[in-house]
Amino acid sequence: MAFRGRRPELRGPPELYYDKNEARKYVRNSRMIDVQIKMTGRALELLCVPEDKPCYVLDIGCGTGLSGDYLSDEGHYWVGIDISPAMLDEALDRETQGDVILGDMGQGIPFKPGTFDACISISAVQWLCNANKKSDIPAKRLYCFFSSLYSVLVRGGRAVLQLYPENSEQLELITTQATRAGFTGGVVVDYPNSAKAKKFYLCLFSGPSTSLPEGLSEDTEEEKPAESTFTADRIPYRIARRGVVRKSREWVLEKKARRRRQGKEVCPDTQYTGRKRKPRF
């Protein structure tokens, strides 16, 4: 029973830990899907990419493609990289709209310089802090990852990496290697006083240093506990993405709220918000 509480990174290499059974959970467990989608939405919000212009986004540790589906839903194009063949097989079975490749981020990002406008990563970077074989040196693998990421981003591009650091020393190791690679930025912490809802987002800028976004707190948004449910079938990716119908009133209100948090000017909500226009003569 004590084994259940161990961090996934301590149970073995990611390509072995994320086998077919583990990959299946990511498309059948409603709790895992909901958490993944919320963190992706928050990462995209922290990126501050233009909402009226599609961007080319790199998804590090893309897994089954849930984060990529969210990006597609927001009108962006994406490419994902993951070290687990089983996770990528699930992504292909779900017919994700982005391209996925098998690769180890600790060995660098295999793309030409200036390929991507932005990058996101959900729950992946902390895996680089563990040495699964004698040749693995966490500091070197982190630097290789960040230096190649810096290269593949356009000038002024941003990366938001959600991660679960084991302790403050591990977080310092990650941020130090990112700084060595040329990035500016810092860590944004959402719900810092909550044991369960607390989330770390490493916000990196490949251009001039800018002010970091503010982290969410219990005063800005109330976190509600969610329950896990399992189904025998895969959840269709359009339902798994958000549970909100695109262009619906709820979808419009959520998008306007996100723009307000980014400090953008947004029209006030009215009874006509999200209502479809009648056809003209």
UniProtKB/Swiss-Prot annotation:
Its EC number is 2.1.1.-. Its main location: nucleus. One of its GO terms (cellular component) is nucleolus. It is an enzyme of class 2 (transferase). One of its GO terms (biological process) is rRNA (guanine-N7)-methylation. May be ubiquitinated and targeted to degradation in response to pro-inflammatory cytokine signaling. Keywords: Chromatin regulator, Cytoplasm, Methyltransferase, Nucleus, Ribosome biogenesis, rRNA processing, S-adenosyl-L-methionine, Transcription, Transcription regulation, Transferase, Ubl conjugation. It catalyses: a guanosine in 18S rRNA + S-adenosyl-L-methionine = an N(7)-methylguanosine in 18S rRNA + S-adenosyl-L-homocysteine. One of its GO terms (molecular function) is rRNA (guanine) methyltransferase activity. InterPro entries: Bud23-like (IPR039769), Bud23_C (IPR022238), Methyltransf_11 (IPR013216), SAM-dependent_MTases_sf (IPR029063). It holds the Pfam family WBS_methylT. CDD domains: AdoMet_MTases. PANTHER family: 18S RRNA (GUANINE-N(7))-METHYLTRANSFERASE-RELATED (PTHR12734:SF0), METHYLTRANSFERASE-RELATED (PTHR12734). Heterodimer with TRMT112; this heterodimerization is necessary for the metabolic stability and activity of the catalytic subunit BUD23. Interacts with GRIP1. S-adenosyl-L-methionine-dependent methyltransferase that specifically methylates the N(7) position of a guanine in 18S rRNA. Requires the methyltransferase adapter protein TRM112 for full rRNA methyltransferase activity. Involved in the pre-rRNA processing steps leading to small-subunit rRNA production independently of its RNA-modifying catalytic activity. Important for biogenesis end export of the 40S ribosomal subunit independent on its methyltransferase activity. Locus-specific steroid receptor coactivator. This is 18S rRNA (guanine-N(7))-methyltransferase. It comes from Bos taurus (Bovine).
